[in-house]
Amino acid sequence: MGWFYYIARLVVKFILFSVTRWKVEGKANIPRQGPLLIVANHLNLADPPVVSVSLNRTAMFMAKEELFRSKFSNYFIRSFGAFPVHRGRLDRQALRQAENVLNEGMALVMFPESKRSPNAQLQAGLPGSALIAVHSCAPILPIGISGTEKMRGPFWILRRPRITVNIGRPFQLPTVGLRANRTELTGLTSLIMQHIAELLPVEFQGNYAKQGKTDAIEN
């Protein structure tokens, strides 16, 4: 990461401390080294930088391709450790890049819902995160974000919203082999989303509030 990354982190932290009530829980659960697939729910465009400054290690991000179209946003987002992914189809190049990040022992952040939740409820996850986890065998670190959905409109700063980043324990998916079929990937994706749901307030869990405890293997 270049100098801009570290300056941007300082700026984001300053903003969060100044205009929000930002709290990070479970920071001790973050492995300090080795490959790590970080998955979180998605409420606001601010979620990637909020997650980044909540971690105690450098992480790369997958971000929608549309954010890279202007020169300024392309420079800013890439400087913050992001690379593009095309939504709505299987982006093999992005998947390969994600696997390379993990194979090099780095951390990668994904938002399995693929887009921001329109009502703060946890939406169904897409299978990309499960596919990457299966191919890389990387441990998964779930994160539940609440409060960033209030960072909207011209006057949200005056409310100083309470933002909580709740970090769970890393876990491994059950072994299914590299050629997991669609049914297996759907089940693994559901496991990932359940881990995220358990870190959210009940009113944010959506359909996953009705599901039982996860049976993945905790590290």
PLM segments and residue spans:
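Non-catalytic C-terminal accessory region of glycerolipid acyltransferases
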Residues: 4-7, 93-219
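Membrane-interface helix-loop junction between the first two transmembrane segments
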Residues: 23-33
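Catalytic core of membrane glycerolipid acyltransferases/transacylases, capturing the structured
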Residues: 5-10, 17-18, 31-89, 97
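Generic structural signal for residues in well-ordered beta-strands
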Residues: 22-24, 82, 165
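Residues at the C-termini of beta-strands that transition into short coil/loop
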Residues: 28, 65, 86, 144, ...
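Short gly/ser/thr-rich secondary-structure transition/capping motifs
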Residues: 17-25, 89, 146-149
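A generic secondary-structure micro-motif detector
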Residues: 1, 62-63, 87-88, 118-119, ...
